[in-house]
Amino acid sequence: MKTRCFDHIDLRVTNMEAAGKFYGKILPQLGFVHESPGDDYYTFYAGGGERPLEFFCLSEDKNHRPNGTRIAFWADTREEVDQISKLVRDAGGKNLEGPEVCEDYSPGYYAFFFEDPDGNKLEICCREKPVFAD
């Protein structure tokens, strides 16, 4: 049986220093507990111990152009979504929508949609009832 379905996210940014500062204020609140900066990358790790590591990596690409891809991070409660949405705005993220209830997604879906300083689209969400496969 698989222990997880993805290993990491590698997001392109145009300014590593600015992106490291921005994500350094947000990702620790989402469970990423270790930072590993490098010259052309910046990695935030979650997991460890009995859990395999998962990581969110920033890679600098001066020619990067954002697209319609959106990455959604899980929050345990609506209050956590609200708290992180404030951190995002204070860190310079662009508020696109919310925080708000998105019933058309699924019952009890609550989310905040935003762009990072490079224009990459992200989301913080929680669900009253998580989705399970049949």
Q: For each predicted feature, which ranges?
A:
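Vicinal oxygen chelate
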Residues: V13-A18, F73-P117
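Acetyl-CoA-dependent GNAT
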Residues: L58-E60, R127-P130
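Conserved Rossmann-like nucleotide-cofactor binding loop
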Residues: N120
